[in-house]
């Protein structure tokens, strides 16, 4: 199985990582070797209605950002930029990151308008400054290109379901292989993937006090019911914070 192969590769990959740190082999060579790890297969039809508990805390996100700042492998650095873009673009799904076109981005209004691949519905996402910063970086190297990120070919026909599936499945595999290596190197207790960016945004937003209905709209869920089902375990913390806001007024009504 893929898991057995990955287990067998682990000692080799660790040895290569150590050799790279000791400058015994080139960083780029090591990066290619690390990408031999087999990533989990992703289906475009997978609904994100099952939360596997994998999300990054603020500390883990900071560690990932620190890794990015010192990363010397160009392609891996690009994959990390895509991960951070997905997070900052309100948890944009990986398939929509891949198929994002410059025509979908309005820099003046600071928003993204796109028909989501999964739901086939038009979705408007407000773009934060970090998301815009990443887009500007890619604008410099993707001038004249149809798609924002170089994950699919410019001639990809989005109406060709089979071609879209193959292109996105291959791209997802490449990104997740690279991210899995990064996750291991920063000591994450789970496998890092693009979908973790989506869950991380949702958890951050809920714990910052955004309402379930707002988070649901930002994620592009069909209904609030889906969002509640997926992130129900994070509601108590948010609800406790809401009740805490009543503390001062309630204190004067306390029975003593």
Place the predicted regions along the sequence by residue:
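N-terminal DNA-binding recognition helix of tyrosine site-specific recombinases/integrases
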Residues: 1-35
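Basic, Lys/Arg- and aromatic-enriched nucleic-acid-binding interface segment
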Residues: 6, 27-94, 98
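Conserved tyrosine-mediated DNA breakage-rejoining catalytic core shared by Y-recombinases
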Residues: 34-35, 99-140
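Short, basic (Lys/Arg/His-rich) helix/loop patches that form interaction surfaces
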Residues: 70-75, 176-217
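Short, polar N-cap/turn motifs at the start of nucleic acid-interacting alpha helices
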Residues: 104-111, 189-190, 210-230
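Catalytic-site neighborhood detector that most strongly recognizes the C-terminal catalytic loop/helix
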Residues: 116-118, 154-155, 219-245
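DNA/chromatin major-groove-contacting recognition/catalytic segments
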Residues: 126, 138, 233-256
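C-terminal secondary-structure termini that scaffold catalytic or DNA-interacting sites
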Residues: 143, 151-163, 244-256
């Amino acid at each position: 199985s893929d898991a057995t192969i990955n287990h067998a590769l682990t000692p080799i990959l660790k040895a290569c990582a150590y050799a790279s740190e000791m400058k015994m082999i080139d960083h780029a060579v090591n990066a290619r070797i690390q990408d031999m790890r087999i990533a989990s297969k992703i289906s475009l039809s997978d609904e994100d209605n099952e939360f596997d508990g994998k999300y990054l805390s603020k500390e883990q996100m900071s560690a990932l950002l620190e890794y990015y700042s010192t990363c010397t492998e160009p392609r891996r650095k690009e994959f990390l930029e895509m991960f951070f873009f997905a997070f900052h673009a309100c948890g944009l799904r990986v398939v929509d990151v891949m198929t994002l076109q410059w025509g979908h981005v309005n820099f003046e209004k600071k928003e993204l308008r796109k028909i989501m691949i999964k739901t086939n519905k038009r979705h408007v996402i407000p773009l934060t400054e970090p998301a815009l910063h990443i887009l500007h970086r890619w604008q410099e190297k993707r001038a004249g290109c149809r798609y924002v990120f170089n994950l699919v070919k410019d001639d990809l026909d989005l109406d060709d379901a089979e071609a879209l599936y193959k292109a996105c499945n291959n791209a997802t595999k490449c990104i997740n292989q690279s991210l899995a290596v990064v996750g291991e190197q920063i000591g994450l207790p789970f496998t890092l993937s693009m979908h973790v960016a989506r869950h991380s945004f949702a958890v951050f937003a809920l714990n910052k006090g955004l309402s379930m209905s707002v988070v649901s709209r930002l994620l592009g869920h069909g209904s609030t019911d889906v969002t509640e089902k997926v992130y129900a375990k994070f509601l108590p913390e948010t609800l406790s914070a809401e009740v805490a806001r009543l503390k001062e007024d309630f204190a004067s009504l306390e029975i003593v």
